[in-house]
Amino acid sequence: MNGVASTGMREAGIEYKLNFGVGIPQLKEIASETGKSSELAVALWKEDIRECRILAALVYPEDQFLPDMADLWIEQIRYPDLAEVCSMYLFSRMKNAAEAAFRWIASDNAITRYCGFLTLAHLLRGEREMGPRYVQEVKDQAEAAISGKDILCAQAAKAVLDRLDRDNG
């Protein structure tokens, strides 16, 4: 438990029902010791406790997690830290991740868009190939997000564009 970290998050407006301030490296270690389990992940997700939700994303078997479930989880994500963990460790590794991410970046909801851009950025880091039509669509959506008012979406969109530029010279 890290009271300083949880207090800092609370002061920044990140208010889970409970927040112990446990760091991601420690949670990853706990998840690796626990192993993958969809039942455990679902039970953990139901708690509005930061560490439980992060652990849920880390222990859910990626091959069993589907975009419909991701849509439900995204509706319940309120803070960027959880969006980042879910996008990196679960959403980008699920079946049909790219299709879901394209849908998310077109959403009116800022957290949903943020998850979409983060998921695409992680897919591109994983050397995932995208056809020219998809590349242009991502560029158009990313440029719109960068010129928008949502700083988090703009940063995630910039990461996607940077990755596309690096890969496509």
Kindly give the residue locations of the regions a language model identified.
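Alpha-helical scaffold domains
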Residues: M1-G169
